[in-house]
Structure formats: structure tokens, C-alpha cells
Amino acid sequence: MQKKKLLVTASTFPRWKGDTEPRFVLDLCSHMTDRFDVTVLVPAAPGAKDREVLEGVRVIRYHYFPIRKWETLCYPGAIVPRIKEKKIRIVLVPFLFLSLYFHLFKILADYDIIHAHWLIPQGIVQSFFSKPYVVTGHGGDVTSLNKGILKALKIKCLRKAEHVTVVSEDLKGKVQELAPQICPSVISMGVDTGKFGRQHYVPDYFGQKSKKVVLFVGRLAEKKGVTYLIRAMKEIDAMLVIVGDGPLRHELQAQAGELEKGKVKFLGGKTHEELKVIFASADVFAAPSVTAKDGDQEGLPTVVMEAMASGLPVVASRSGGIPQLITDGVNGLLCEEKNVRQLKDNISKLLNDEELYHRLVEEEKKTISNYDYRTIAGRYMEIYE
């Protein structure tokens, strides 16, 4: 029997094999190739191939600006942070919208099912076609930019969709604030639980010697709250390892420079393979996320799931969809946004209370089994059918 053809549109996707860009859309798609013929349509990026196959998924990268080296709106990182970093990039936005529209116009008829990840721009552009589609809200695409024409276009996108999904219960409420008649399904992104674990542990991987290691992985942007984590580490006898890049890197490095030498290490972006070792070789994972000034919030961070799948206890803030994943004192520890004292106390508890440490790790194993990509992909495929 011939497989149905699935077209997935997204704006965050690996640019090549071994890229440091988030790969959750690729992970989801690669778990569907047994039942669907999957194609992903994503923006082009300097150095990336226009056409290739990654893990059984056909990838089409569309160009959106005449000068190719200026196609920097989406990578590395995401559209809104890229614009914040350099305001001039906003001139690329209409080119991206128009190019996506024309590429969809050319190929939509070839596909049976359409799935748009993020309301902006994929969902909005898709709403200008009559073909039914599924749209998924991931976080800031739902919670921020809710004024004027963009808000109206987002509401149109939600109302026209055949099915709306969001990655957290928190985002479900935010969608219903925009369009009260819409009842989204809550289906998170996931984690390939078989690929993470303590089997990847490497002794003294960070050069920490006898010190414990607190780990952060993520984009160095406002909503990640790394500035509060650095402040919390001032009185903690441990090393902080920061993995990732972003517009706040230089500012955060300057802040870290005020602490004792060697207390904070910035490793930059790392590949998926490197992250397996990094997670397994740390002691505690911290996700001190906050609500950004423009309303941008976490959805359900995949890095938290990856930490849990690696057997790493998590300290996180009550921000966005995180409390859906972490229950305070049961499978992790939670603190209020921007509360440096609570963040410090929770990290200290995990570093000094061995019984608590192991109890939380055992509970998070039970939690994360529900977020394996085989389960998540199955839920999406039920919607497609």
C-alpha cells in the first residue's frame, strides 16, 4: 500500500548532519517514516544544502532573499531572537513570508497532509490556502507578538486549522485567550529515551576534578534566565557549565567573570552526539526560565526532557509549560521565576542530599517514559489519519 504524503513546514531545523540547531522537528518526523512519506520544507541557510535526505526525511530548503549570504533570519537560533540581535533583519520578514507562500503554492497539491510547526510564519502562511492543515504552537509564537495585524493573522490561522496542537497545558490556555472557540490538543515534543543515559558518562569531562557540575543547555536569550543562574552560583561550591549560544553570550560572560576564575565554563553550541555525553557527565540540570519582556515564554523545553532521560535531576522555574513536566519535590525541584535565593537553595539541596537526589531521579524516569518519541509520534499520526 502506498504511503500518504506528509508535508511538514518549520523554521527551526538542523541545517546539516551534526548541526547544533534544535532537532525536535526532525526527531518527530523520523519516527513517522514507516507510515508516511515525509517531506520537510524549511528556510535556507548559508552552507546548507537545498535538497537532502536526513534520517529518512526528505528536506527542501527554500531561498527567500536574492543575496544568499543575507539569509540569516532563522539561523542560528530563532526568528524573534535574531531580529532582537540585529534590528535590520526585520526587513527579511516579508521576503520569508512571500517565499514560503510561493513555494507552498507550487507543491501543496502533491501532499495529502500538511503540518505547520509554529503559528508564525508557517501557520499564518498556510492559512491563506484552502487545503486543511494541522498547526502546532510551541511557545513564543503563541505568547508574544499579540498586537495589531499579527494578532489578527494568528487568530485566523487558529480558526482555519483542521486541528490545533500545543506542546503544553499552559499554551492551551494562551491559545484559548486568542481564540476561545478553539480547543487544542496538548501533545508535547519528545525525547528519544534510548539515546540518553548515564552509560555516556565520561569522568572529569569538564575538567572539574572533584567539583560537582551544574549544567545549563539552551539559547542564551532573555527567556532562558541564565543571568539568575549565574547569580545563584555565587555561593554554591560547584562548577557551572553553560552550553549554547545567543545574543546575551557576551553579557553573560562578563557577568560570570565577576565570580571566581574557572567557576563558570561556556562551551558554545554542541551537537546532539556531544550533548549525550554532556548530560551524562554533569550532576544537576538547571532550567531557570523566565517570561521575557515581550511575553515570550517556554513551551515545554526538550532539553529538560533530555536531562531527565539522562538521569540528571532538574531544578527549574515555574515558567511556561515546565510545571506540566516537573512536580515540585516529586520528580524535580521548582522555584519562582527570577528568584535567585530559591534557585540557589534548590541546587544546594540536590548537591548535598543524596537521598533526595536519587529519589527524584527514580521518579523522573517514570515521568519521561511518557514522552518518548514513539509515543508522541503515534499521537500525531492518529490526528493525521
Regions found by a protein language model. Name each.
Residues 1-63, 234:
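N-terminal subdomain of nucleotide-sugar transferases
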Residues 342, 349, 356-370, 381-382:
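A short, well-ordered alpha-helix in the C-terminal region of glycosyltransferases
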Residues 304, 309, 313-316, 326:
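Short hydrophobic beta-strand element within catalytic cores of glycosyltransferases
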Residues 325-329, 333-340, 348-355, 369:
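Conserved acidic donor-binding segment of nucleotide-sugar-dependent glycosyltransferases
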Residues 280-297, 312:
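Acidic donor-binding loop of glycosyltransferase active sites
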Residues 23, 212-235, 247-253, 341, ...:
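A conserved mid-protein helix/loop that constitutes part of the nucleotide-sugar donor-binding site
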Residues 253-274:
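Nucleotide-activated donor-binding/catalytic signature segment of Leloir-type glycosyltransferases, i.e.
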Residues 68, 145-148, 176, 191-205:
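Acidic anion/phosphate-binding donor-loop and adjacent secondary structure
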